[in-house]
Amino acid sequence: MVEAVKVSELVKDLPSLRVVEGKEYLDQKLINTSDISRPGLELTGYFDFYPKNRIQLLGRTEISYSARLDHDLRERVFNKMATPETPCFIVSRGLPIPSEMLEAAEKEKIPVLSSNMATTHLSSVITQFLDEKLAPRKSIHGVLVEIYGMGVLIIGNSGVGKSETALDLVKRGHRLIADDRVDVYQKDDKTVVGEAPKILKHLMEIRGIGIIDVMNLFGAGAVKDSTEIQLIICLQNWDPKANYDRLGFNEKTREIFEVDVPQVTVPVKVGRNLAIIIEVAAMNFRAKKMGYDASQKFEQNLTELISDNSKKDEGDSRK
């Protein structure tokens, strides 16, 4: 988990933001929460519950109200709003920035930013960016590919063939997100997202060949930066004593950050085309999400057949 984000990262990743004052302080100021403050009551002088550690975002309402205050009161208010813990001030809609704010920010070495975006939209964009940056994170040993627009995480013991299978999937037109190590973070209560570490981005390790650059070999369409993990495929070496699911009735899940992700176990055996099997597993999962379950259809047909045979047997016995 990233404990804090530098204001410089915010400015770099959101081109709509421009620095008005305090460029030299961008690397010094840290943001440790995705919550954003709209200082309305503070402009009236009420600071009892002032969230000083949040980004202070001022829109048309706040700027127009501050313009009605006399100079001394406006100066006192902005001096109180500017604290050592305050990461930055942001003014939306390209509105004029009060000189009292600039002076107060300079005293506490706080960057002042501006944007032409509407306040609500800007707040949403910043919150989404910070949610992703500050989200809980962990690494999973596996390969992440996107099959027909659906993120599939392939896991299994070392040497079982995860990378080779992913390479086959890439050749079949699917996309690689990460090989060997997948960095995973929780986007919201029901969504986990996977991406590659920067040092491994677009790279794969194939035993006997070494490191290959997938984007260089197969083109930009063969890779993607990140994707939601919707299905997990667990590759296991074939065990003749194991009882593998042959009908698909027993649905299993794997918990990642308290999010239950469906998991399918695929036994690995010489002669099995794993890429096609995983491709079909992804399509079958998508069909289930759309309301069609082949295993349930089979069970329904079997029940109807048994029922018809029972009725036929009853009729024959009466004769």
UniProtKB/Swiss-Prot annotation:
Residues annotated as catalytic: H141, K162, D180 (proton acceptor), R246
Chain positions covered by the region annotation Important for the catalytic mechanism of dephosphorylation: 267-272
Residues at which ATP binds: G156, N157, S158, G159, V160, G161, K162, S163
Cofactor: Mg(2+)
Catalytic activity field: [HPr protein]-L-serine + ATP = [HPr protein]-O-phospho-L-serine + ADP + H(+); [HPr protein]-O-phospho-L-serine + phosphate + H(+) = [HPr protein]-L-serine + diphosphate
Binding site for Mg(2+): S163, E205
Any one GO molecular-function label of the UniProt entry: protein serine/threonine kinase activity
Pfam families noted in UniProt: Hpr_kinase_C, Hpr_kinase_N
Protein EC: 2.7.11.-, 2.7.4.-
InterPro entries: HPr(Ser)_kin/Pase (IPR003755), Hpr_kin/Pase_C (IPR011104), Hpr_kin/Pase_Hpr_N (IPR011126), P-loop_NTPase (IPR027417), Ser_kin/Pase_Hpr-like_N_sf (IPR028979)
Residue ranges of the region described as Important for the catalytic mechanism of both phosphorylation and dephosphorylation: 204-213
GO biological process, one term: regulation of carbohydrate metabolic process
Source organism, top-level taxon: Bacteria
Keywords, alphabetical: ATP-binding, Carbohydrate metabolism, Kinase, Magnesium, Metal-binding, Multifunctional enzyme, Nucleotide-binding, Serine/threonine-protein kinase, Transferase
Note: Both phosphorylation and phosphorolysis are carried out by the same active site and suggest a common mechanism for both reactions.
Subunit annotation: Homohexamer.
Similarity annotation: Belongs to the HPrK/P family.
Domains as described in the record: The Walker A ATP-binding motif also binds Pi and PPi.
NCBIfam families registered for this protein in UniProt: hpr-ser
Function of the protein: Catalyzes the ATP- as well as the pyrophosphate-dependent phosphorylation of a specific serine residue in HPr, a phosphocarrier protein of the phosphoenolpyruvate-dependent sugar phosphotransferase system (PTS). HprK/P also catalyzes the pyrophosphate-producing, inorganic phosphate-dependent dephosphorylation (phosphorolysis) of seryl-phosphorylated HPr (P-Ser-HPr).
HAMAP family in alphabetical order: HPr_kinase
UniProt-recorded name of the protein: HPr kinase/phosphorylase
UniProt organism field: Lactobacillus johnsonii (strain CNCM I-12250 / La1 / NCC 533)
